[in-house]
């Protein structure tokens, strides 16, 4: 079983991926965690690191190539990342999560300990614009085109556990 979980920042991809990985005993490969770790290692915030990635394609290409490689070599995995649904060609289930911008910004502000939601809003918009530009430039992928996903969920009103129940129905259907 190969599952991809994608979505914009703050939509809950990491939380749901961790939940499902634990529940189904699947290995989790997370592009966002790799990206955040690289930013921390360079002593940069995500917006600044995103700007660096715009000028240094090797950052995105390295993360994406690693996810693609793991997905071709392993089974029983969840690959979480903005482009994982496009990069993992042999995925059994491709999921896209979303939520209204204000909801996502609130989650990001909480997660990243940003006290000013206006600052979080600005950073989120900049990050999303930066990512959309890079994905189009590197891969000719329009991140707003969701046609390759099997399941698209708005996460605003559901807890991680409730989202897990919804996705479990899809997993059961794929396994049958």
Curated annotation (Swiss-Prot):
InterPro entries xref list: Cyt_kin_arch (IPR011892), Cytidylate_kinase_dom (IPR011994), P-loop_NTPase (IPR027417)
Principal localisation: cytoplasm
Protein name (record): Cytidylate kinase
CDD domains the record matches: CMPK (cd02020)
EC code: 2.7.4.25
Keywords for the protein's UniProt record, in alphabetical order: ATP-binding, Cytoplasm, Kinase, Nucleotide-binding, Transferase
Catalytic activity: CMP + ATP = CDP + ADP; dCMP + ATP = dCDP + ADP
EC class: transferase
Superkingdom classification of source: Archaea
Binding positions for ATP per the UniProt entry: 7-15
GO annotation, cellular component aspect: cytoplasm
Organism for this UniProt entry: Methanosphaerula palustris (strain ATCC BAA-1556 / DSM 19958 / E1-9c)
A biological process from GO: pyrimidine nucleotide metabolic process
Subcellular location field: Cytoplasm
Family listed: Belongs to the cytidylate kinase family. Type 2 subfamily.
Pfam families: Cytidylate_kin2 (PF13189)
GO molecular function: ATP binding; CMP kinase activity; dCMP kinase activity
């Amino acid at each position: 079983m190969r599952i991809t979980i994608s979505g914009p920042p703050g939509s809950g991809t990491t939380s749901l991926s961790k939940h499902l990985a634990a529940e189904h005993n699947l290995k989790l490969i997370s592009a966002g965690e790799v990206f955040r770790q690289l930013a921390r290692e360079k002593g940069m915030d995500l917006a600044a690191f995103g700007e660096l990635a715009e000028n240094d394609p090797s950052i995105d290409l390295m993360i994406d190539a690693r996810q693609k490689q793991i997905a071709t070599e392993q089974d029983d995995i969840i690959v979480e990342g903005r482009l994982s649904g496009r990069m993992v060609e042999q995925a059994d289930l491709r999921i896209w999560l979303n939520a209204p911008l204000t909801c996502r910004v609130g989650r990001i502000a909480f997660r990243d300990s940003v006290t000013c939601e206006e600052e979080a809003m600005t950073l989120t918009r900049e990050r999303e614009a930066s990512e959309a530009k890079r994905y189009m430039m590197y891969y000719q992928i329009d991140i707003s085109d969701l046609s390759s996903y099997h399941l698209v969920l708005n996460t605003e009103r559901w807890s991680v556990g409730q989202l897990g129940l919804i996705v479990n129905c899809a997993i059961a259907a794929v396994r049958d």
